[in-house]
Amino acid sequence: MIENVMLQYEELRLRLEELKPAIDDLKSAIGVEKIKQEIAQLEDQAAAPDFWEDMKNSQAVLQKTSQLKAKVTAYEQLCSKYDDAMTTIEIADEENDESLYGEACSAVSDVEKDLEEQKLTTLLSGEYDAKNAILAFHAGA
Protein backbone atom coordinates (compact mmCIF):
# COMPACT_ATOMS: atom_id res chain seq x y z
CA MET A 1 0.00 0.00 0.00
CA ILE A 2 2.74 2.46 0.99
CA GLU A 3 4.79 1.44 -2.07
CA ASN A 4 1.79 2.09 -4.29
CA VAL A 5 1.34 5.57 -2.81
CA MET A 6 5.04 6.33 -3.23
CA LEU A 7 4.86 5.16 -6.84
CA GLN A 8 1.87 7.40 -7.55
CA TYR A 9 3.70 10.42 -6.17
CA GLU A 10 6.84 9.54 -8.12
CA GLU A 11 4.79 9.41 -11.33
CA LEU A 12 3.29 12.81 -10.52
CA ARG A 13 6.73 14.24 -9.78
CA LEU A 14 8.05 12.97 -13.12
CA ARG A 15 5.01 14.33 -14.96
CA LEU A 16 5.61 17.72 -13.36
CA GLU A 17 9.36 17.68 -13.97
CA GLU A 18 8.71 17.02 -17.67
CA LEU A 19 6.99 20.41 -17.81
CA LYS A 20 10.00 22.36 -16.48
CA PRO A 21 11.84 22.63 -19.84
CA ALA A 22 8.64 23.89 -21.50
CA ILE A 23 8.20 26.48 -18.73
CA ASP A 24 11.79 27.62 -19.21
CA ASP A 25 11.26 27.79 -22.99
CA LEU A 26 8.14 29.86 -22.40
CA LYS A 27 10.17 32.33 -20.33
CA SER A 28 12.56 32.93 -23.21
CA ALA A 29 9.74 32.94 -25.80
CA ILE A 30 7.88 35.60 -23.85
CA GLY A 31 11.10 37.47 -23.13
CA VAL A 32 10.33 38.06 -19.45
CA GLU A 33 13.56 39.94 -18.69
CA LYS A 34 13.17 42.16 -21.75
CA ILE A 35 9.55 42.86 -20.83
CA LYS A 36 10.54 43.84 -17.28
CA GLN A 37 13.04 46.33 -18.71
CA GLU A 38 10.40 47.72 -21.06
CA ILE A 39 7.95 48.08 -18.16
CA ALA A 40 10.57 50.05 -16.22
CA GLN A 41 11.13 52.36 -19.21
CA LEU A 42 7.40 52.91 -19.69
CA GLU A 43 6.95 53.64 -15.99
CA ASP A 44 9.77 56.18 -16.22
CA GLN A 45 7.93 57.83 -19.12
CA ALA A 46 4.72 57.88 -17.07
CA ALA A 47 6.55 59.58 -14.21
CA ALA A 48 7.72 62.44 -16.42
CA PRO A 49 6.13 65.81 -15.57
CA ASP A 50 4.88 66.40 -19.14
CA PHE A 51 3.46 62.88 -19.56
CA TRP A 52 -0.21 63.89 -19.47
CA GLU A 53 0.14 66.69 -22.04
CA ASP A 54 -0.29 64.22 -24.90
CA MET A 55 -3.38 62.20 -23.95
CA LYS A 56 -3.17 59.72 -26.85
CA ASN A 57 0.44 58.90 -26.08
CA SER A 58 -0.17 58.67 -22.33
CA GLN A 59 -3.10 56.29 -22.83
CA ALA A 60 -1.04 54.16 -25.22
CA VAL A 61 1.84 54.00 -22.74
CA LEU A 62 -0.44 53.03 -19.85
CA GLN A 63 -2.21 50.39 -21.96
CA LYS A 64 1.09 48.92 -23.13
CA THR A 65 2.38 48.87 -19.53
CA SER A 66 -0.75 47.07 -18.39
CA GLN A 67 -0.47 44.45 -21.15
CA LEU A 68 3.19 43.78 -20.41
CA LYS A 69 2.56 43.49 -16.67
CA ALA A 70 -0.22 40.99 -17.37
CA LYS A 71 2.19 38.81 -19.38
CA VAL A 72 4.81 38.83 -16.64
CA THR A 73 2.23 38.20 -13.92
CA ALA A 74 0.76 35.24 -15.82
CA TYR A 75 4.22 33.69 -16.21
CA GLU A 76 5.09 34.27 -12.56
CA GLN A 77 1.79 32.69 -11.49
CA LEU A 78 2.61 29.64 -13.63
CA CYS A 79 6.00 29.33 -11.90
CA SER A 80 4.33 29.68 -8.52
CA LYS A 81 1.81 26.95 -9.37
CA TYR A 82 4.68 24.71 -10.47
CA ASP A 83 6.52 25.28 -7.18
CA ASP A 84 3.34 24.73 -5.14
CA ALA A 85 2.56 21.49 -6.98
CA MET A 86 6.09 20.20 -6.45
CA THR A 87 5.93 21.11 -2.74
CA THR A 88 2.59 19.33 -2.35
CA ILE A 89 3.98 16.21 -4.00
CA GLU A 90 7.13 16.25 -1.86
CA ILE A 91 5.23 16.72 1.40
CA ALA A 92 2.68 14.04 0.56
CA ASP A 93 5.41 11.64 -0.53
CA GLU A 94 7.49 12.18 2.62
CA GLU A 95 4.48 11.62 4.86
CA ASN A 96 3.06 8.78 2.71
CA ASP A 97 -0.23 10.68 2.81
CA GLU A 98 -2.63 9.19 0.28
CA SER A 99 -5.26 11.81 1.09
CA LEU A 100 -3.19 14.49 -0.70
CA TYR A 101 -3.04 12.53 -3.96
CA GLY A 102 -6.16 14.18 -5.40
CA GLU A 103 -4.86 17.64 -4.54
CA ALA A 104 -1.46 16.84 -6.05
CA CYS A 105 -3.06 15.50 -9.26
CA SER A 106 -5.20 18.61 -9.51
CA ALA A 107 -2.18 20.87 -8.98
CA VAL A 108 -0.20 19.12 -11.74
CA SER A 109 -3.19 19.33 -14.09
CA ASP A 110 -3.52 23.06 -13.37
CA VAL A 111 0.14 23.61 -14.26
CA GLU A 112 -0.29 21.64 -17.50
CA LYS A 113 -3.42 23.59 -18.42
CA ASP A 114 -1.88 26.99 -17.65
CA LEU A 115 1.26 26.11 -19.58
CA GLU A 116 -0.75 25.16 -22.68
CA GLU A 117 -2.83 28.35 -22.44
CA GLN A 118 0.27 30.52 -22.16
CA LYS A 119 1.97 28.72 -25.04
CA LEU A 120 -1.08 29.39 -27.22
CA THR A 121 -1.24 33.01 -26.08
CA THR A 122 2.44 33.43 -26.91
CA LEU A 123 1.88 32.03 -30.39
CA LEU A 124 -0.99 34.47 -30.89
CA SER A 125 0.79 37.58 -29.72
CA GLY A 126 1.55 39.27 -33.02
CA GLU A 127 0.80 42.87 -33.87
CA TYR A 128 -2.70 42.15 -35.18
CA ASP A 129 -3.68 39.22 -32.96
CA ALA A 130 -5.51 41.44 -30.45
CA LYS A 131 -7.80 42.72 -33.23
CA ASN A 132 -11.11 41.24 -34.32
CA ALA A 133 -11.35 39.11 -37.43
CA ILE A 134 -14.06 38.49 -39.99
CA LEU A 135 -14.22 34.99 -41.40
CA ALA A 136 -16.11 33.94 -44.50
CA PHE A 137 -16.79 30.30 -45.32
CA HIS A 138 -17.53 29.30 -48.90
CA ALA A 139 -18.83 25.92 -49.97
CA GLY A 140 -16.68 24.12 -52.45
CA ALA A 141 -14.43 21.22 -53.08
Question: Could you say what each language-model-derived stretch is?
Answer:
Residues 2-133:
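Charged, heptad-repeat coiled-coil alpha-helices that serve as long linker/dimerization "arms"
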Residues 133-141:
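Short, hydrophobic beta-strand segments
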